[in-house]
Amino acid sequence: MAEKSYYIITHGCQMNVHDSETIAGILESMGFVPSPEEKTADLIIINTCSVRETAENKVFTKIGELKKLKRENPDLVIGVGGCIPQQEKVAKRLLERFPHLDFIFGTHNLPELPKILERVFEKHERVLEVWQSEGQIVEGIPVKREPGVRAWVTIMYGCNNFCTYCIVPYVRGRERSRKKEDILQEIRQLVAEGYREVTLLGQNVNSYGKDLKGKPMFAELLADIEKIDGLWRVRFTTSHPRDLTDDVIEVMASSRKICEHLHLPVQAGSNKILKAMHRGYTREYYLNLVEKIRAKIPKVSFTTDIIVGFPGETEEDFEQTLDLVRKVRYDSAFTFVYNKRTGTPAAEMKDQVPEEVKSRRIQELIELQNGISLELNKNEEGNIHEILVEGKSKTDETKLAGRTRTNKLVVFNGNEDLVGKLVKVKITEGKLFHLEGVLV
């Protein structure tokens, strides 16, 4: 195949971002080169998200927009991957609705991408290749990461929880853990390449190892990662509150490398709604867990996910969510208005909340959380933090940016030769979404 260029469009979560790094690695191992923009590419791949129907609609819009490029360049090859094709009806609808699409593949058969592209480019076939069941985890697939000091490492795939609002178990499959040694070897290689921080990825990292021989648990994996020389920081996401065990908390508390930050999605503060969501814990359990973690790790910061307007949510239920937010005092929160997700049990539930009520509630929640976030950031003024310098600030290229161990973004003046180093920064101003500081 003559040298061709590629362009990847990524929608969705960090798992998708990492999948796009894998797609890029596969393409470059085949001789493709990255294109700076989609209009100059020979191959465009859209890596899709299906967690919400609004995300799907964005993808459909984008595919439609690419029709013009295909008219201008009939040799352009367009493919769709990710979570959307894992829904069989949607995948077939894509091919019918968008005749300019050349191929579709799913999350489970990413390793088959070279064969799919050979069929498209060499045999000029139109390909729909989506495995509905999970295959074995394939190791050794090349990954093309952006240069930097932080890297994402997938430790497991899929989810067994089947929360009633969530499509993920249906499109990502059941939980499958990577072998511990494969994960450790990948991290050692990343350190050799100059990365100094890794974030471990999984839909529920606390379930890691339950499907493996010998059942090496998440705490054991963390303890072994801690021993890797040259690695400075470790983070992980996402943690399901029900599965966050005491041994993980103990490893975090005793670690020099695991950062004092937990993303602990609560989703709702009402026991009635938590039960309807099939979350597997109560409000009281969650608050006790937070208290237990803070007792062991006093400087820990918490972030969360919250859904507003779930079917059956009353004003009393919503007030319980607000009360929980006041009690926990999250550093930040990802807040979402509930929207029906076709294919999930919640979409069929009665007592759907009116849109105007959901809009009012989400604004009330955002105002409460923003007030807490700003207050916590203001409390940092005068404190000195160790910052891993990541690069130039995205909002002010004259400044550098990095993160505290508690995952707060800090912007400060400094020379570019500090990128990739640990520095001490005194916080001068706490703002809503970041901190300002000076080198000390």
From Swiss-Prot:
It catalyses: N(6)-dimethylallyladenosine(37) in tRNA + (sulfur carrier)-SH + AH2 + 2 S-adenosyl-L-methionine = 2-methylsulfanyl-N(6)-dimethylallyladenosine(37) in tRNA + (sulfur carrier)-H + 5'-deoxyadenosine + L-methionine + A + S-adenosyl-L-homocysteine + 2 H(+). Residues 378-440 form the TRAM domain. Keywords: 4Fe-4S, Cytoplasm, Iron, Iron-sulfur, Metal-binding, S-adenosyl-L-methionine, Transferase, tRNA processing. GO terms for cellular component: cytosol. It is found in: Cytoplasm. It holds the Pfam family TRAM. [4Fe-4S] cluster 2 binds at residues 159, 163, 166. Its cofactor is [4Fe-4S] cluster. InterPro entries: Elp3/MiaA/NifB-like_rSAM, Methylthiotransferase, Methylthiotransferase_CS, Methylthiotransferase_N, Methylthiotransferase_N_sf, MiaB-like_bact, MiaB_methiolase, rSAM. Residues 4-122 form the MTTase N-terminal domain. The keyword Metal-binding applies. PROSITE patterns: MTTASE_N (PS51449), MTTASE_RADICAL (PS01278), RADICAL_SAM (PS51918), TRAM (PS50926). Its main location: cytoplasm. GO terms for molecular function: 4 iron, 4 sulfur cluster binding; metal ion binding; N6-isopentenyladenosine methylthiotransferase activity. Its EC number is 2.8.4.3. Binds 2 [4Fe-4S] clusters. One cluster is coordinated with 3 cysteines and an exchangeable S-adenosyl-L-methionine. Monomer. Belongs to the methylthiotransferase family. MiaB subfamily. Catalyzes the methylthiolation of N6-(dimethylallyl)adenosine (i(6)A), leading to the formation of 2-methylthio-N6-(dimethylallyl)adenosine (ms(2)i(6)A) at position 37 in tRNAs that read codons beginning with uridine. This is tRNA-2-methylthio-N(6)-dimethylallyladenosine synthase. The gene is miaB.
